[in-house]
Amino acid sequence: CKKAVACGAKFIVSPGYSEEVVSWCVENNVAITPGCVTPTEIMAAMSHGLKVVKFFPANVYGGLSAMKALSGPFGGIKFIPTGGVNDKNLAEYISAPFIHAVGGSWLCAKADIAAHNFDKITSLCKEARKTALGFEIAHIGVNAGDAEESLAVCRALDAAFGFGVKEGNSSNFAGSGVEVMKVGRPDKNGHIAVKTNSIPRAAAE
């Protein structure tokens, strides 16, 4: 890691935990993310003030279920799983609250790098980002004049389509897809609610 830093590296990520490497990085103010898959390794990382660790290989050491179990006693720790993460399970990983980030070799295959196929790599990265954010329409918002009208609209939709009615404080829902506000709002034309796997990541876009 000393050679990497001498060559300009601003952070170090290691597949496993090395006390020597972690101590040197902390002492020299170099960001370090060590691989930790056991309580002992996580506690060692925490003793140096670290809050993010790598979990590798994730598919071998239990994946999400293992990290979820570890996040119980180590609630302040976030994981970066690599190994077994791909475009098929990316959304499941990234939406877990104890996941800081993920890594996957499918984004930058050695063959694509060697062939300078950067357009393909860029496309894969964009698709991964889209999957990670997981934008979907959550519901459509409709404005009603008052609480009585709001409930009447929801009941009409339920009668027509069997959506079901859920009454709330400031609005009522017809199923999960239509929200009818009880009073007028500044957004006079209603609203469209979009959900995401991660609000902080979405806000950074």
Predicted regions and their residues:
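C-terminal helical cap(s) of enzyme catalytic domains, especially alpha/beta-barrels
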Residues: 25-30, 111-133
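Catalytic beta/alpha-barrel core
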Residues: 1-2, 8-18, 31-42, 51-59, ...
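N-terminal beta-strand motif that seeds the catalytic metal site of vicinal oxygen chelate
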Residues: 129-154, 187-194
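Mid-chain, well-packed structural core segment of small domains
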Residues: 185-205
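Catalytic cores of alpha/beta
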Residues: 1-7, 40-49, 65, 71, ...
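Conserved, mostly hydrophobic/aromatic
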Residues: 4, 25, 53, 93, ...
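Core segments of cupin and vicinal oxygen chelate
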Residues: 141-183, 201-202
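Glycine-rich phosphate-binding active-site loops on the catalytic face of alpha/beta enzymes
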Residues: 16-21, 54-64, 98-121
